[in-house]
Swiss-Prot record:
GO terms for molecular function: manganese ion binding; RNA binding; RNA-DNA hybrid ribonuclease activity. A divalent metal cation binds at residues 7-8, 105. Coiled coil: none annotated. Its EC number is 3.1.26.4. SUPFAM superfamilies: Ribonuclease H-like. The lineage of its organism: Archaea, Methanobacteriati, Methanobacteriota, Thermococci, Thermococcales. One of its GO terms (biological process) is DNA replication, removal of RNA primer. Transmembrane segments: none annotated. The gene is rnhB. This is Ribonuclease HII. It comes from Thermococcus kodakarensis (strain ATCC BAA-918 / JCM 12380 / KOD1). Monomer. Its main location: cytoplasm. Belongs to the RNase HII family.
Length: 228
């Protein structure tokens, strides 16, 4: 029997791609994944994730990594959950080795609904099990999580080569916010690596525009008093 796991990395960032990884392994090879001690990618160091990446590939029967650029995410129709279900299905439908059972990390608060909606979009028959924190429960989902996270990390590193320090890309990262504020202040717009429509961008733009107006008012006052 063939078992699949699927997970994403980069759902919440304002910068960079979302990456979805779907993996397939024979049930007889599951102990090999367990021997690698795969687990939720967020609980592993970048160095450990990189090492596991190639080791995981050696155990798999098949895998697909889908990289969704920020412009596609920002211009999507529907909710982020719907977008994720559609692209989970796209990744799974692209597998050459079709699984009999799929374990997925549920993006929906309703696990059964997520499993049902994912199953309805598949072009093959398979049992779908969706759980919250599936990457902590099922090694096959942990493996998918690691492939997705490493791929996103590599993409972010490439962006840093072009744009400098952008942080992790998450709105809560002060480095990311500083980069976006400075870029908007200098260019009057955000770089093409952001996800348009994110509330963070609106807040930053409003903050910078407010600061510019305050600076202009102060400059006007300074000129007036110099004349006086």
């Amino acid at each position: 029997m063939k078992i699949a796991g699927i997970d994403e990395a980069g759902r919440g960032p304002v910068i960079g791609p979302m990456v979805i990884a779907a993996v397939v392994v024979d049930e007889n090879s599951l102990p090999k994944l367990e021997e690698l001690k795969v687990r939720d990618s967020k609980k592993l160091t970048p160095k450990r994730r990189e090492k596991l990446f190639n080791e995981i590939l050696g155990v798999l029967d098949d895998y697909v990594i889908l990289e969704l650029p920020p412009d596609v995410i920002g211009s999507r129709e529907g909710t982020l959950n719907e977008f994720e279900v559609e692209n989970f299905a796209k990744a799974l439908n692209s597998l050459k080795v079709k699984p009999d059972v799929i374990y997925a990390d549920a993006a929906d608060v309703d696990e059964e609904r997520f499993a049902r909606e994912l199953g309805e979009r598949l072009n093959f028959e398979a049992e779908v099990v969706a759980k919250h924190k599936a990457d902590d429960i099922f090694p096959v989902v942990s493996a998918a999580s690691i492939l997705a996270k490493v791929t996103r990390d590599r993409a972010v590193e490439k962006l840093k080569e072009e744009y400098g320090e952008i942080g992790s890309g998450y709105p809560s990262d002060p480095r990311t916010r500083a980069f976006l504020e400075n870029y908007y202040r200098e260019h009057g717009e955000f770089p093409p690596i952001v996800r348009k429509g994110w509330k963070t961008l609106k807040k930053i733009a409003e903050k910078v525009e407010s600061e510019k107006k305050a600076e202009e008012r102060q400059a006007t006052l300074d000129r007036y008093f110099r004349k006086v």
